[in-house]
Regions:
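Short amphipathic alpha-helix with an adjacent loop that forms part of the alpha/beta core around
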Residues: 100-107
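N-terminal Rossmann-like NAD(P) cofactor-binding module of classical short-chain dehydrogenase/reductase
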Residues: 111-113
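Short, solvent-exposed turn/loop segments enriched in Gly/Ser/Thr/Pro and often Arg
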Residues: 78, 115-120, 141-143, 148, ...
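N-terminal secretory signal peptides and thylakoid transit peptides that target proteins
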Residues: 1-19
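Beta-strand-loop-alpha-helix segment that lines the small-molecule cofactor/substrate pocket
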Residues: 117, 122-170, 184, 422
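Conserved SAM-binding strand-loop segment of SAM-dependent methyltransferases
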Residues: 93-97
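Contiguous beta-strand/loop segments that form the cofactor/metal-binding neighborhood of enzyme cores
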Residues: 176, 188, 193-195, 202-249, ...
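N-terminal Rossmann-like dinucleotide-binding module
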Residues: 18-89, 168-171, 181, 263
Length: 456
């Protein structure tokens, strides 16, 4: 190994490896029959299998069902967590290992939801798409940048219908925000701020938690999936995994695909060939967990007719400085979450999902007429209807992986910047590399536990 190369786990106290996906608990050969988009009749229900059946998995399951899907199978390593989903979809076959489910039921499945902790998104979605199945994957799309690039590539090759679960992207508010921005009402935007009240789970923890007995209903080995082995503790699952590097992506990973979406879309950041990220504030980060609070500055060069812009991410209670000409009694964003765009002619703000966009100060909205709609609205303003209808009729969803992957890359690169401890890092979008500190490219991927590897 080149002496300048270090591993992600060297930062997080381990080592890295890559290989081809080989893991499957069943020896049965996976079914590879391909479901062609648009070949499921609009009058025919889409057979959906759910990877993750509790919490957000239950939400995704029931929303897919509401949109017209037929839930045929549910896989979850924690059957206590999945119990409500099992009850509400009694006819669905029940599994602990989604790989066994796909092996045994591949021919009966058209599509899958992936609603698992971040670290297992990519292996599940990868396997689903390799079988020619459509996929709805929760945000952030992946745990690492390399995984995000891989899933985009595989989705293009498989020609399947994909959707990431940043539901605000399908709603009217963010579309109105883009139309307002593109009308030029606030002029040239050189600075934007995005913030969240997350983390609402513990972070800043220096060591793994002590071992506890594994609940009888849980297969802890399956839950760990790709991550290095560690003892079970109830403070990892089912929720607080978000605050552990091995399982989650911290506050920016959890929320940027929601809150930063408005900036990413309206400022056309997807067109940037490079960008630079720097951690301005980082308090309490450890090898085990993300920081208690952070501010990350991400600089994007000019894109088409749009000039350079700096986007600031704030979490852990940090808020952007209120502009002097916005009265103190006027809300910016939703308060604890939101975005603020600072233009040469004024200000534009929006809520958590890009909703309720409005000019500031409030007086600017008194006589303002929003532009006529120019962006297509999504069926029912709903990502699940969008996904199911595109499976039946063909076409691309709003947050398909060609969009979701680059958005996830920006969010995950914020975490890479946190590990650089204040050093500005330059990212080459086309080649997927850090250009000014190559040793940090190890942080764009991760170690995979044997049996769960991906070709990244």
């Amino acid at each position: 190994m080149d002496k300048n190369q270090i591993t992600r786990r060297a930062f997080l106290a381990a080592s890295t490896t890559t290989a081809v996906l080989t893991g499957c608990a069943s020896s049965q050969k996976p079914n590879t029959a391909k479901v062609v988009p648009g070949k499921v009749s609009p009058n025919q229900k889409v057979n959906v299998a759910c990877i993750g059946g509790g919490g957000k998995g239950l939400d995704d399951m029931m929303n897919a069902k509401k949109a017209g899907a037929n839930i045929v199978a549910i896989a979850d390593p924690d059957w206590n967590r999945a119990a409500e989903g099992f009850y509400k979809c009694k006819d669905a076959k029940q599994y602990k290992d989604y790989r066994v489910m796909l092996d045994e039921m591949g021919k009966d499945i058209d599509a899958c939801t992936v609603s698992t902790p971040d670290h297992t998104h990519a292996p599940a979605a990868y396997r689903v798409m390799k079988l020619g199945k459509h996929v709805y994957c929760q945000k952030p799309l992946t745990h690492t940048i390399a995984e995000a690039r891989l899933l985009r590539k595989v989705a293009q090759e498989a020609k399947v219908v994909t959707q990431m679960g940043n539901q605000g992207h399908c709603q009217v508010g963010v579309r109105e925000l883009c139309e307002m921005m593109w009308s030029g009402v606030i002029g040239d935007v050189k600075e934007a701020h995005v913030w969240t009240n997350r983390p609402i789970w513990p972070q800043g923890i220096a060591a793994p938690l002590p071992a506890e007995p594994v609940p009888a209903e849980m297969d802890w080995n399956l839950w760990i999936g790709t991550a290095p082995e560690r003892a079970y503790n109830s403070k990892y699952a089912p929720f607080n995994w978000r605050g552990w590097w091995d399982f989650g992506c911290g506050a920016i990973g959890d929320m940027a695909c929601h809150i930063m979406d408005a900036a990413f879309w309206s400022l056309n950041l997807i067109e940037a060939e490079t960008f630079t990220a720097q951690a301005i504030v980082s308090e309490g980060m450890t090898d085990q967990t993300p920081p208690l609070k952070s501010t990350i500055k991400i600089d994007f060069p000019a894109r088409g007719k749009m000039g350079p812009v700096s986007v600031y991410w704030h979490d852990g209670g940090i808020l952007p400085t209120r502009p002097a000409d916005i009265p103190a009694d006027q809300k910016i964003g939703d308060g604890n979450n939101g975005s603020l765009f600072i233009g040469s002619k004024g200000y534009l703000t929006a809520g958590e999902y890009g909703g309720h966009p409005r000019l500031l100060p409030d007086s600017k909205m008194a006589d303002y007429k929003k532009p006529a709609p120019s962006i297509k609205r999504v069926s029912h303003n709903d990502p699940y209807y969008d996904w199911i209808e595109c499976i039946q009729n063909g076409g691309k969803t709003a947050s398909n992986f060609d969009y979701a992957s680059p958005l996830t890359v920006v969010a995950n690169f914020g975490n890479v910047a946190l590990h650089a401890k204040g050093e500005p890092l330059i990212y080459d979008v086309k080649n997927g590399k850090v250009t000014n500190n190559p040793k940090l490219n190890a942080l764009l991927t991760k170690e995979y536990r044997k049996g769960w590897e991906l070709p990244v």
